[in-house]
A protein has these predicted regions:
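Helix-loop interface residues and adjacent transmembrane-helix termini in multi-pass membrane transporters
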Residues: 49-52, 88, 119-122, 152, ...
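Membrane-water interface segments that mark the loop-to-transmembrane alpha-helix transition
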Residues: 19-39, 60-61, 66-114, 127-133, ...
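Membrane-interface junctions at transmembrane-helix termini in multi-pass inner-membrane proteins
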Residues: 18, 22, 79-88, 138-161, ...
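Hydrophobic alpha-helical transmembrane segments
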Residues: 126-133, 161-206, 220-224, 231, ...
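Residue-level signature of transmembrane alpha-helical cores of multipass secondary-active transporters
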Residues: 24-32, 62, 98, 131-132, ...
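Interfacial/gating helices of multi-pass transporter permease domains
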Residues: 42-69, 124-127, 220-224, 228, ...
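Interhelical loop/hinge segments that connect adjacent transmembrane helices in multipass membrane
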Residues: 8-17, 21, 156, 199-244, ...
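Helix-loop junctions and terminal segments of transmembrane helices
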Residues: 70-88, 150-151, 261, 265-279
Length: 279
């Protein structure tokens, strides 16, 4: 009887895993598909209202925000998913580590903004970069929640949150662009997206950080997360180094045209990667 019961348990677990995987693929495809469709639709309207120079100005800052985002998360989202049964202390440790690292990086980049503007010969980058860099600082408050949702395979909720963030941010960007805000409309679009994303994560997870700060769990995860961190930074630099070089030596209109062409070219690949990665 014990053997039969054990076999039954294994079969039940296998069926449950298959069901979760199927649902994960479905909602992953829904998430990636809706993201692509919305970005295309809103992107067409925005492209008619904004100039290549506007996209170029924002494109220059992309490599800074992405590298800062990689350093901020440090692969801990995947590390949390990799833990068999993460505790509340694990999530809390990752939360405070991300917030402190992000705050440090934001302060450094805030005071580096004039140097960035001088390097690219774009005075507007001083104030613009300080605002755009808020996006990765705000993002740090939702990384632990994102890990929680991925670990618990809350794929439906992830899709809903992402959809609401996309709608909200694109509508704001479109309204601002229509009213002549130029590159500021793209900057606000980024910040609003992260803000709504975090609000949704807090709403669906119900998890809240506490002030019992212990970085012990982070140290245990570091061996796993640092490998992802290095890989992500290498990918980020290789994918955005040309935009960085163009921004320094070429007219800003050319930077914008290249940045937009690259973004549209990578949409198909990101659809597949995001669909599988959400499982």
């Amino acid at each position: 009887k014990q053997v039969i019961f054990h076999i039954y348990q294994i079969e039940t677990m296998a069926e449950s895993l298959k069901e979760k995987t199927a649902k994960g693929l479905f909602w992953g495809a829904m998430n990636s598909g809706s993201t692509q469709v919305l970005n295309i639709l809103f992107g067409i309207f925005l492209a008619r209202l904004l100039s290549p120079a506007d996209y170029g100005i924002i494109g220059i800052l992309t490599i800074f925000t992405l590298i800062a985002g990689n350093l901020q998360s440090s692969g801990f989202t995947q590390a949390l998913v990799n833990i068999r049964k993460p505790t509340d202390n694990d999530y809390n440790s990752v939360f405070w580590f991300n917030v402190l690292v992000s705050l440090t990086m934001y302060v450094v980049l805030f005071f580096s903004a004039p140097l960035i503007a001088d390097f690219f010969h774009q005075p507007c980058l001083t104030s613009l970069s300080r605002f755009v860099f808020l996006s990765f600082f705000i993002s740090s408050f939702g990384i632990a929640q994102n890990g929680y949702m991925m670990k618990n395979m809350m794929n439906k909720e992830i899709t809903i949150v992402n959809f609401m963030a996309l709608i909200s941010s694109n509508v704001v960007g479109l309204v601002l662009a229509f009213n002549g805000m130029a590159y500021w409309s793209l900057a606000w679009q980024q910040v609003i997206f992260i803000l709504v994303l975090n609000i949704g994560r807090y709403y669906y997870t119900g998890w809240r950080p506490n002030f019992h700060i212990d970085f012990g769990p982070v140290r245990k995860m570091f061996g796993f997360s640092v490998k992802l961190l290095v890989t992500n930074i290498i990918n980020t630099v290789s994918n955005n180094v040309l935009t960085f070089v163009f921004g320094r030596f070429y007219p800003i209109n050319d930077v914008g045209n290249y940045s937009q062409a690259y973004n549209w070219d990578t949409k198909a690949n990101s659809f597949v990667a995001n669909t599988v990665g959400q499982i």
